[in-house]
């Protein structure tokens, strides 16, 4: 609530568009949900966006207040502010950012939060929350703009609420005992909607700030949940195959035999709801507790319960490999305009 109260005290109005230009940080979520409580509209901008792309979205969405992450985002945003009269205020998440000596209007997020730490700031937010409607605009999701000018898709709270309801019905196994790794950028509707659902279900969110560090982060966090795009799993597949191919003959034989067993068990029997032969089931259970368990421990995925994958086609070879080694992916399809998920495969079948 403190972020929402700070927004009200700062003068951010009902259904006012605000920008969030940052890599994944916890402050992004504070800002998003503070905006929702304040009935403002947070608009995510890719952390790698150029000043020209930022300028376009700021003008197109009539953004007056822009939250920025680290030094790169601040530098770009300040350049845009100098040529965009409508962009009046920058709020900086990272206190290590060095402001331009000519910057007289930007403030750090820590200072911004203090604005909400007074009794007067609480009242308007309570009124706004009481007046909130599912018809309120929740966010505008802009495309990356790599092939043309970015286009903004309008999503209302009703879109998110319906998404929560249907995912709750389809994924009852997601509970407050889970931990989800936030890896995809929160500017991507897949991650944004997935995080919203996880918070709705009481899931703990672990945020991976630097995409290049994900291989180090996963073994530290051991997530049970993580949504991702096929490219991530393609890299996992290639890496594992290289390790197997460069292993001594006996180890290579053990891994290849286990993968063959897993493929037969999962794809030919389990996924078709056919009871496997006892010998196959025993062999699979042994491989699952030894070979596959070791592989998943190395990857940091040994606690994995559900790994949704979407955003692009997933090749059959990668899909079959992941199912063979018992990594619980759930392949689906979605769009920004549909608040991500349109459909996804069941766990079995």
Q: Residue ranges of each PLM-predicted region?
A:
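Short hydrophobic alpha-helices that are characteristic scaffold elements of the AMP-binding
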Residues: 32-38, 60, 196-200, 237, ...
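Conserved ATP-dependent adenylate/AMP-binding module captured primarily in the ANL superfamily
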Residues: 49-79, 163-181, 211-225, 298
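ANL superfamily adenylate-forming
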Residues: 72-134, 240-294
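Conserved pre-ATP/AMP-binding loop-to-beta segment of ANL
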Residues: 117-142, 149, 173-179
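Conserved AMP-binding A3 loop
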Residues: 138-164
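Active-site loops of AMP-binding adenylate-forming
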Residues: 157, 314, 323-327, 335-349
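Conserved AMP-binding/adenylation subdomain of ANL enzymes
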Residues: 161-179, 186-292, 303, 328
């Amino acid at each position: 609530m403190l972020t929402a109260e700070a927004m009200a005290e700062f003068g951010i109005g009902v259904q006012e568009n605000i920008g969030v230009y940052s890599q994944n940080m916890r402050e992004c979520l504070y800002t998003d949900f503070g905006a929702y409580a304040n009935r403002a509209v947070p608009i995510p901008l890719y952390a790698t966006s150029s000043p020209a792309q930022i300028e376009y979205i700021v003008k197109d969405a009539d953004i007056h207040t822009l939250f920025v992450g680290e030094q790169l985002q601040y530098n770009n945003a300040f350049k845009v502010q100098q040529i965009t009269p409508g962009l009046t205020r920058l709020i900086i998440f990272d206190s290590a950012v060095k402001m331009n000596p000519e910057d007289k209007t930007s403030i750090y997020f820590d200072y911004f939060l203090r604005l909400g730490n007074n009794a007067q700031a609480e009242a308007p937010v309570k009124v706004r929350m009481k007046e909130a409607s599912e018809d309120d605009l929740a966010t505008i999701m802009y495309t990356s703009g790599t092939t043309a000018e970015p286009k903004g898709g309008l999503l209302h709270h009703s879109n998110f609420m319906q998404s929560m309801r249907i995912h709750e019905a389809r994924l009852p196994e997601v509970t407050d005992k889970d931990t989800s790794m936030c890896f995809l950028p929160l500017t991507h509707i897949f991650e944004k909607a997935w995080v919203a659902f996880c918070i709705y279900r009481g899931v703990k969110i672990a945020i991976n700030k630097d995409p290049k560090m994900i291989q180090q982060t996963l073994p530290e966090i051991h997530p049970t949940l993580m949504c991702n795009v096929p490219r991530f799993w393609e890299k996992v597949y290639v890496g594992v195959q290289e390790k197997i191919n460069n292993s001594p003959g006996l180890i290579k034989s053990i891994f290849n035999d286990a993968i063959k067993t897993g493929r037969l068990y999962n794809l030919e029997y389990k996924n078709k709801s056919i009871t496997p032969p006892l010998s196959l089931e025993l062999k699979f259970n042994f491989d699952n507790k030894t070979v596959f368990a070791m592989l998943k421990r190395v990857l940091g995925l040994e606690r994995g319960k559900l790994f949704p994958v979407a955003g692009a086609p997933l090749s059959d070879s990668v899909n079959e490999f992941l199912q063979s080694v018992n990594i619980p992916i759930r392949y689906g399809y979605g769009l920004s305009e549909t608040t991500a998920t349109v459909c996804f495969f069941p766990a079995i079948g």
